[in-house]
Amino acid sequence: MNLHEYQGKQLFAEYGLPVSKGYAVDTPEEAAEACDKIGGSEWVVKAQVHAGGRGKAGGVKLVRSKEDAKAFAQQWLGKRLVTYQTDANGQPVTKILVESCTDIAKELYLGAVVDRSSRRIVFMASTEGGVDIEKIAHDTPEKILKATIDPLVGAQPFQGRELAFQLGLEGKQVAQFAKIFVGLAKLFQDHDLALLEVNPLVIKADGDLHCLDAKINIDANAMYRQPKLKTFHDPSQDDPREAHAAKFELNYVALEGNIGCMVNGAGLAMGTMDIVNLHGGKPANFLDVGGGATKERVTEAFKIILSDTNVAAVLVNIFGGIVRCDMIAEGIIGAVKEVGVKIPVVVRLEGNNAELGAKVLAESGLNIIAATSLTDAAQQVVKAAEGK
């Protein structure tokens, strides 16, 4: 689950980290009032969406009057912001963050992720702040500094000082960086985060360090023990199809192709998408119906896939283990009848009662194409999507 910038900074403040004074507002009038509360003559106004690249898309602006702050809120509230990280529809803007202005001397980067290879939290820092860190890591990996956190003792101040020296910090900045480093590590562990970024972490004109941005992603599998963070969830930022799928315990991710995929098992689903790509097709989604692929879940899966108007054909790839393939076949037939599927459906069944499942499909009288193998299924669905 992602957090908005203002929510991330709220957590930063709770851990004693330096953040700008700001208010998240819902109306243009509140934006003007926030300027009065903050004081000063310049403010930064930011559209709050779960996506990067807001500045280049016009979603971040420096304003010098309350009227300009109000106008910015009027421009964006209720609208959708399209950035390089969103799809063509963009993300809806329901809040604007109004902040005090920061005099920036230099921009740094500081972030943390769970490194699956070492099974540790790993911090990354760079002198190249305020830019796309993935590009820096790819083009100039030597500019990315790392510190691995021992889960038994946690982040240590000396690790923060080592990173600070490597970043070229000096004087009071070293102690400030170590405090931020340890605070972020505690925040990461306390709240079961999957990713944390401060980009940029800035050196102000007076030499102090300041967290100018906050990007936080929480491990969805740990939400049951983070009741406070559950209240931070903003459903407006969710893909409607993904949110609907979650209600039925379906793992769905929308993509930009035209071949709908319905598979049981995440690994098999990824393999299915790969082989569709290999044969020239483009998957419209990732959809894992899980081990309990009942008729009801298969029906909902079809509804979700077909809600994407780009879908020209559907590939159903089921491996029957505990779940019998003949039962899955009956579920597919029932779902196709109930939903009224008008596009080609290619089905590949393998495993428990696969032959019986294929027979059930063949005797259904429906326009369902039975595939003999995964390769055959991919070739058939690509042809069907192309109208061949």
UniProtKB/Swiss-Prot annotation:
Residues involved in Mg(2+) binding: N199, D213
Cofactor note: Binds 1 Mg(2+) ion per subunit.
Cofactor(s) listed in the protein's UniProt record: Mg(2+)
GO BP, one annotated term: succinyl-CoA metabolic process
Sites where the protein binds substrate: N264, G321, I322, V323
Binding site for ATP: K46, G53, R54, G55, E99, T102, E107
Keywords, comma-separated and alphabetical: ATP-binding, Ligase, Magnesium, Metal-binding, Nucleotide-binding, Tricarboxylic acid cycle
Lineage: superkingdom: Bacteria
Role this protein plays: Succinyl-CoA synthetase functions in the citric acid cycle (TCA), coupling the hydrolysis of succinyl-CoA to the synthesis of either ATP or GTP and thus represents the only step of substrate-level phosphorylation in the TCA. The beta subunit provides nucleotide specificity of the enzyme and binds the substrate succinate, while the binding sites for coenzyme A and phosphate are found in the alpha subunit.
Descriptive protein name: Succinate--CoA ligase [ADP-forming] subunit beta
Taxon lineage: Bacteria, Pseudomonadati, Pseudomonadota, Gammaproteobacteria, Pseudomonadales
